[in-house]
UniProtKB/Swiss-Prot annotation:
PANTHER family: CAP-GLY DOMAIN-CONTAINING LINKER PROTEIN 4, DYNACTIN 1-RELATED MICROTUBULE-BINDING. Residues 387-482, 565-599 are annotated as: Disordered. Residues 443-462, 576-587 have a biased composition (Low complexity). This is CAP-Gly domain-containing linker protein 4. It comes from the Eukaryota. The modification Phosphoserine is found at residue 557. Keywords: ANK repeat, Phosphoprotein, Repeat. ANK repeats lie at residues 65-101, 149-180, 186-215. Residues 468-478 have a biased composition (Polar residues). SMART domains: ANK, CAP_GLY. It comes from Rattus norvegicus (Rat). SUPFAM superfamilies: Ankyrin repeat, Cap-Gly domain. Residues 303-345, 505-547 form the CAP-Gly domain.
Length: 599
């Protein structure tokens, strides 16, 4: 039923209640009010309705202002409106609107709007909680859904991260359905919605009030599965990555323990199935495998799991690029060091071929190995410049190291040089370990013996409080492979921001390796710290973190271009966010080539 279905009923004035009280008070059928524009004063200097303004107050309290117009005011997502949800809502009720009537444009009730108005930074939580309690006392139905979004009041409160409203809704609503699903979120629950939107407060409150962390949506995902991966987050969301990690751990810790007694008493057919599948693939536990042609590790587990259906392989990686220590949701499938464990479907793994067990099959590795296989004897040649060639002993050591992938190379170097002063263990960042490889610019010739020696960097302090070891030495004291970025080097971040590398290594806020860059202008997000962990020091808003794929060495042409990009960034249109897509990155490189050619 819509308001248009009512015969010649004026929406303005108090006469509506007197003439047609049966349509509103105590009515079981909710009314959907027609769509209207928000009324604005003729001399208004701003584009939104401000209930604190005198001219706006005249309109708000005018009995001739219709319910449809008041709903239109509620749709304005500005603090001036959302923080006065109770004043505007009471005016709607005064005009005879039923507590469960709906806005014709959004199909939302007053309770839906109230749950939105509790959003931090826009509305006022205390006001929203009081008005929500008032609406529920008047008979507001918390189970009603918007027919546009299929969301009920609990879904809205979870989406906008208002734990105080979640408590009110679940305390007063009957029946208490904390796991009600929503079709717009793959039939996930409020816990799925909160987890997907990184609403830590809502996740914690829902778990406390009995939400099921093992509930699976239509895609078979539990709430922990829908938490965004920090690696996929934009550059500006380094702080959100720490929240994502916290939420996922919170959800995994709350997973129910598996019933191992029942499994122990039943014949385990899964073991037979797993062995048969491994035999078909020509694999066995302990074999070296490659995951999706990228990550290399050792097969430690094969079988069914609690976190997903089907057969899964558990792999202990060579590098800390995994997700766990062999356990998921308090179920230990195999044991390994933290971040060295990962699970993958059997279709994603292949056995490493003999003779290439330690090689990750990447194009760069193949090209490097091909180049190294072509050796020329230049021992009899006397070079006028330092060619970077080492003694036969060093050369043999280098060859054995270079035949390994990056992960094994770091481990071998750390093991061989553990007793040497100034060396760094394998737990240090990749940047600090790159000095183990030979580099022509870092070799010096002794005048007395004519032998070439490799300069070593001094020993480095560790950050025990941060739980990681990062290199703080200057770029001049580190030796890298050719083309690698060094600490202290000026770089360009995502083709726009210019800064200096101050940190490189693993972090607590996201897996993988990250560059910490001190920008030349205050366009950053932090002071070198994220989530209370200090990775490097700089002025506030001068620090930013970026993955290696988004950082490039600053050349002369890039330096000029970065100034142009920086100026454009300062004059970007409001309401639009830059998209750092692959297309824009390739266009950036094209511009660089054109500038270089013009010179």
């Amino acid at each position: 039923m819509t308001i248009e279905d009512l015969p010649d009923i004026p929406l303005e004035g108090s006469s509506l209640i007197g003439r047609y009280p049966f349509l509103f008070t105590g009515s079981d059928t909710s009314v959907i009010f027609s769509i209207s524009a928000a009324p604005m004063p003729s001399d208004c200097e701003f584009s939104f309705f401000d209930p604190n303004d005198a001219s706006c107050q005249e309109i708000l309290f005018d009995p001739k202002t219709s319910v449809s117009e008041l709903f239109a005011i509620l749709r304005q997502w500005v603090p001036q409106v959302q923080q006065n949800i109770d004043i505007i809502g009471n005016e709607i009720l005064k005009r005879g609107c039923n507590v469960n009537d709906r806005d014709g444009l959004t199909d939302m009730t007053l309770l839906h709007y109230t749950c939105k108005s509790g959003a931090h930074g826009i509305g006022d939580v205390e006001t929203a909680v009081k008005f929500a309690a008032q609406l529920i006392d008047l008979g507001a139905d918390a189970s009603l859904r918007s027919r546009w979004t299929n969301m009920n009041a609990l879904h809205y409160a979870s989406y906008f991260d208002v734990p105080e409203l979640i408590r009110v809704l679940l305390k007063t609503s009957k029946p208490k359905d904390v796991d009600a699903t929503c079709s717009d979120f793959n039939f996930g629950t409020a816990l799925h919605i909160a987890a997907h939107n990184l609403c830590a407060g809502a996740v914690k409150t829902l778990l406390e009030l009995g939400a099921n962390p093992a509930f699976r949506n239509d895609k078979g995902q539990i709430p922990a599965d829908v938490v965004p991966d920090p690696v996929d987050m934009p550059l500006e969301m380094a702080d959100a990555a720490a929240i994502a990690k916290e939420i996922k751990q919170m959800l995994l810790d709350s997973m129910p323990l598996p019933c191992t007694i029942t499994k122990a008493t039943l014949p385990n057919c899964d073991i037979t199935t797993s062995k048969a599948m491994l035999t078909t693939l020509g694999l066995k536990l302990g074999d070296r495998v490659v995951i999706a042609g990228q990550k290399v590790g050792t097969l430690r587990f094969c079988g069914t799991t609690e976190f997903a259906s089907g057969q899964w392989a558990g792999i202990e990686l060579d590098e800390p690029e995994g997700k766990n220590n062999g356990s998921v949701g308090r179920v230990q499938y195999f044991k390994c060091a933290p971040k060295y464990g990962i699970f993958a479907p059997l279709s994603k793994i292949t056995k490493v071929k003999d003779g290439r067990k330690n090689i990750t099959h990447t194009p760069s590795t193949k090209a490097t190995l091909h180049a190294r296989s072509q050796k020329v004897d230049v021992a009899h040649v006397t070079s006028k410049v330092n060619s970077g060639l080492m003694t036969s002993k060093k050369e043999n050591a280098s060859e054995s190291t270079l035949s390994l992938p990056r992960s094994e190379e770091l481990k071998t170097v750390a093991k061989n040089d553990a007793t040497q002063p100034g060396c760094i263990s394998s737990s240090s960042s990749t940047s600090s370990l790159d000095h183990k490889q030979s580099h022509p610019k870092k070799l010096s010739t002794s005048s007395s013996s004519g032998k070439k020696t490799l300069s070593k960097s001094p020993s480095l302090p560790s950050r025990a409080s941060a739980g990681l070891k990062s290199s703080t030495t200057s770029a001049a004291n580190n030796t890298h492979r050719e083309g690698a970025l060094r600490l202290g080097e000026r770089v360009l971040v995502v083709g726009q921001r210019v800064g200096t590398i101050k940190f490189f290594g693993t972090t607590n806020f996201a897996p993988g390796y990250w560059y910490g860059i001190e920008l030349e202008k205050p366009h950053g997000k932090n002071d070198g710290s994220v989530g209370g962990v200090q990775y490097f020091s700089c002025s506030p808003r001068y620090g930013i973190f970026a993955p290696p794929s988004r950082v490039q060495r600053l050349s002369d042409s890039l330096d000029t271009l970065s100034e142009i990009s920086s100026n454009k960034q300062n004059h970007s249109y409001p309401g639009f966010r830059r998209s750092f897509s692959t297309t824009s990155a390739s266009s950036q490189k094209e511009i660089n080539r054109r500038n270089a050619f013009a010179k």
